[in-house]
C-alpha cells in the first residue's frame, strides 16, 4: 500500500513540535512545565516565552499526535484483533520501560493503554458520525472532570505547582545522579500518571483517538477533500483555537499563575482550544500540500514522521544525556532552552533521512513489528472479534 506522505509529514511535525514543550521538562523541574512562575518569581523573558508556546504549541502537538494515533488504529483494523492487541501491549511495555528507566515524561504508556480500549470502539462504531460524536463526548467528559477538580481544589498552592527549595534541590539531585533512587522517583511518576490517566486525561486522549479514527474513516486524513475545503477549515479552526486560548493566557499572567485558577480552571480554555488548533494545523498542511511538497525539508520531516517512535525515543536519549548526564539541568531559562531544540530537530531529520535511504522502517519500528509478528503471528485480513 502506497504511503500517505502528507500524513507522514503531519506526524513528523507533531513529533518535532512536542519537543518545543518537552525541552522545558528536560531542562527544568517538573513544576516548570505548566507554571512559568514555578520558582516564585518570573522574568518578562520567561513570561513571554511561556505565553507564545502556550498559544501555538502547549497541548496542541500532543493532541495532533493523539489524533494521528487514532487514525492509525483505524488503519490497523484489517490486521485483526491479535495483531492490534499484541502491538499495543508491546507499546505499553515499551512506555513502562521508557518511563521507569529513562524519563518521567513518557507518553507511550498512556497511548498504549488507551489504545487497547479505543481500538474496539473504533471497530464497533457503525458510522463515521457516531465515531466522531463519541470522541467529542469523551473529550468533553475529560474537560468536565478537570472543571470538577478545579472547583473542589484548595486555593492554597501545591508543592507540585510551586515547589520549595528543598524539593527543587532533591529533584535536581536524583535526576543528575540517577541510579536506584531515580528509578524509584520515576516509578512514583508513572503511578501518578496512571492515576491522572484513569481519572481525567484518559477521557480526553480517548476522545482525540476516536476523532482521529473518524477523520481517517471519512477520508479526511487521506486527503480526499478539496484543497479549498482544507484551507478554509484550517484557517477557521486555528482562529477559533486562538480566540479561546488567548484570554486564558492573559488571565493567568494577570493572576500571577495562582494555583487554583491556573493549575485547573484556566487550563480548560487551553484544553478546549487544542483540538481546534491541532485539526486546523493538519488541515492547513493538507490544503497547502502542493506548495509544501516542493521543499526538500518538508519531505525530510515526512521521514521523521515515518520513524515517529524512533525519533521520540531519540529525543529522550539526546536530552537526558545533555541535561542529566552532562549536568545541564537547571542551567538555562525557558527561552534559552529553545536553543537546544533546533540541534535535536536536525538530529531527528538527518538520522531519519539517512536511515530510510537504506531501510524501509526505523529501527524501533522494525523491532516493534518483529515482536508483534512473534506475539500475534501473521496479520489476518479480517478483523476478528
Which residue stretches match the model-derived regions?
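Solvent-exposed interhelical
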Residues: 80-82, 119-134, 214-236
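Specific transmembrane alpha-helix
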Residues: 63-78, 109-122, 200-223, 273-293
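N-terminal signal-anchor module of multipass membrane proteins
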Residues: 1-69, 76
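Membrane-interface interhelical connector segments
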Residues: 32-35, 251-265
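Membrane-proximal cytoplasmic C-terminal regulatory module of class A 7TM GPCRs
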Residues: 360-385
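Long hydrophobic alpha-helical segments that form multi-pass transmembrane helix bundles
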Residues: 133-215
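Alpha-helical transmembrane segments of multi-pass integral membrane proteins
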Residues: 205, 259-358
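Juxtamembrane membrane-water interface segments that cap and precede transmembrane helices
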Residues: 41-53, 178-193, 257-267
Amino acid at each position: 500500500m502506497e504511503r500517505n506522505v502528507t500524513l507522514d509529514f503531519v506526524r513528523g511535525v507533531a513529533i518535532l513540535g512536542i519537543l518545543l514543550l518537552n525541552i522545558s521538562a528536560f531542562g527544568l523541574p517538573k513544576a516548570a512545565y505548566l507554571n512559568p512562575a514555578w520558582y516564585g518569581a518570573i522574568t518578562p523573558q520567561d513570561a513571554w516565552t511561556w505565553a507564545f508556546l502556550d498559544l501555538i504549541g502547549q497541548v496542541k502537538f500532543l493532541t495532533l499526535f493523539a489524533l494521528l494515533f487514532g487514525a492509525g488504529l483505524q488503519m490497523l483494523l484489517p490486521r485483526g484483533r491479535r495483531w492490534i492487541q499484541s502491538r499495543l501491549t508491546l507499546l505499553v511495555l515499551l512506555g513502562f520501560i521508557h518511563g521507569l528507566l529513562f524519563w518521567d515524561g513518557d507518553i507511550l504508556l498512556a497511548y498504549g493503554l488507551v489504545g487497547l480500549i479505543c481500538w474496539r470502539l473504533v471497530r464497533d462504531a457503525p458510522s463515521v458520525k457516531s465515531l466522531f460524536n463519541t470522541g467529542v463526548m469523551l473529550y468533553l467528559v475529560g474537560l468536565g472532570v478537570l472543571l470538577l477538580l478545579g472547583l473542589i481544589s484548595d486555593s492554597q498552592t501545591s508543592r507540585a505547582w510551586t515547589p520549595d527549595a528543598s524539593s527543587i534541590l532533591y529533584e535536581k539531585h536524583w535526576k543528575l545522579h540517577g541510579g536506584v533512587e531515580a528509578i524509584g522517583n520515576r516509578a512514583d511518576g508513572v503511578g501518578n500518571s496512571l492515576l491522572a490517566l484513569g481519572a481525567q486525561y484518559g477521557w480526553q486522549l480517548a476522545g482525540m483517538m476516536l476523532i482521529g479514527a473518524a477523520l481517517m474513516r471519512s477520508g479526511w486524513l487521506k486527503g480526499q477533500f478539496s484543497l479549498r475545503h482544507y484551507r478554509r477549515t484550517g484557517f477557521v479552526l486555528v482562529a477559533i483555537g486562538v480566540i479561546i486560548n488567548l484570554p486564558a493566557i492573559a488571565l493567568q499572567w494577570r493572576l500571577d499563575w495562582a494555583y487554583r485558577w491556573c493549575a485547573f480552571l484556566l487550563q480548560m480554555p487551553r484544553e478546549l482550544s487544542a483540538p481546534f488548533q491541532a485539526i486546523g494545523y493538519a488541515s492547513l498542511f493538507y490544503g497547502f500540500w502542493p506548495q509544501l511538497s516542493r521543499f526538500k525539508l518538508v519531505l525530510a520531516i515526512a521521514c521523521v514522521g515515518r520513524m515517529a517512535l524512533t525519533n521520540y525515543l531519540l529525543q529522550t536519549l539526546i536530552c537526558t544525556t545533555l541535561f542529566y548526564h552532562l549536568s545541564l539541568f537547571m542551567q538555562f531559562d525557558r527561552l534559552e532552552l529553545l536553543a537546544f531544540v533546533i540541534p535535536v530537530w536536525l538530529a531527528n531529520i538527518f538520522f531519519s533521512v539517512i536511515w530510510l535511504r537504506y531501510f524501509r522502517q526505523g529501527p524501533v519500528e522494525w523491532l516493534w513489528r518483529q515482536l508483534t509478528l512473534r506475539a500475534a503471528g501473521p496479520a489476518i485480513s479480517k478483523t476478528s472479534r
